[in-house]
């Protein structure tokens, strides 16, 4: 009697997550090595992002042209391009994902601007300001390289030391809130004193 029970295939782990968390050390190290070498070469020769993209486009179009020409010369058959069509489901899913991302960004901006506390707002503005300064000092491929290096280091550090980081951040948040409350109370006291002093001067003048 044949066994009808089939085992479910084991789910495949996410390759990107494995690289960021260094579960596949060889692949993560290879990614870091290739990106570092590419960044050094680009910085050494002074290439810009537009130049690199243009050269990649030239190479891709040239290879496709040679491939199509060889197919026509050898087999006299036109290249099969039906597999290059973009399905409607893919387009709909891509549009839905982009819309959800934009809606989430808009909601996040309104939460930070209208609903969050002052230190969240200040931290967000400071982050955007630092990002703008980095953008003025660095070119595009350097920013991409820094982002990749941070992506390969920050998640791993957060996985190992996330609890300690959250503990210190919570302590810093409480201290900042206490300092803000103290400063706010002192400012209110000074305003009240100035207001009472002004009223007394007005009464004396009358």
UniProtKB/Swiss-Prot annotation:
Gene (UniProt): RTNLB13
Listed GO biological process terms: endoplasmic reticulum tubular network organization; response to bacterium
PANTHER family recorded: RETICULON, RETICULON-LIKE PROTEIN B13
GO CC annotation: cytoplasmic side of endoplasmic reticulum membrane; endoplasmic reticulum membrane; endoplasmic reticulum tubular network
Membrane disposition: Multi-pass membrane protein
Highest taxon of the lineage: Eukaryota
Annotated TM spans: 27-47, 50-70, 134-154
Statement: the UniProt record of this protein carries the keyword Transmembrane helix: yes
Entry keywords, A to Z: Endoplasmic reticulum, Membrane, Transmembrane, Transmembrane helix
Compartmental location: Endoplasmic reticulum membrane
Organism placement in taxonomy: Eukaryota, Viridiplantae, Streptophyta, Embryophyta, Tracheophyta
Coiled coil spans: none
Signal peptide: none
InterPro entries with a match to the protein in the record: Reticulon, Reticulon-like
Record domain Reticulon: where: 16-206
Alphabetized PROSITE patterns for the sequence: RETICULON
Record's protein name: Reticulon-like protein B13
């Amino acid at each position: 009697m044949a066994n009808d029970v089939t085992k479910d295939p084991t789910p495949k782990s996410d390759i990107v997550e494995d690289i960021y968390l260094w579960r596949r050390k060889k692949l993560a190290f290879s990614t870091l090595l290739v990106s570092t070498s590419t960044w050094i070469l680009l910085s050494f020769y002074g290439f810009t992002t537009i130049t690199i993209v243009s050269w990649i486009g030239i190479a891709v179009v040239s290879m496709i042209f040679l491939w199509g020409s060889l197919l026509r010369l050898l087999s006299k058959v036109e290249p099969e391009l039906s597999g290059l069509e973009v399905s409607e489901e893919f387009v709909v899913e891509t549009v839905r994902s982009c819309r959800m991302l934009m809606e989430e960004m808009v909601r996040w901006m309104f939460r930070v601007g209208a609903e969050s506390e002052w230190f969240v707002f200040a931290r967000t503005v400071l982050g955007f300001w630092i990002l703008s300064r980095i953008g003025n000092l660095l070119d595009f491929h350097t920013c991409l390289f820094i982002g990749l290096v941070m992506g390969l280091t920050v998640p791993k550090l957060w996985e190992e030391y996330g609890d300690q980081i959250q503990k210190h951040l919570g302590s810093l948040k409480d201290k900042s809130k206490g300092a803000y409350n103290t400063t706010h109370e002192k400012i209110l006291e000074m305003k009240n004193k100035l207001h009472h002093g002004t009223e007394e001067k007005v009464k004396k003048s009358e």
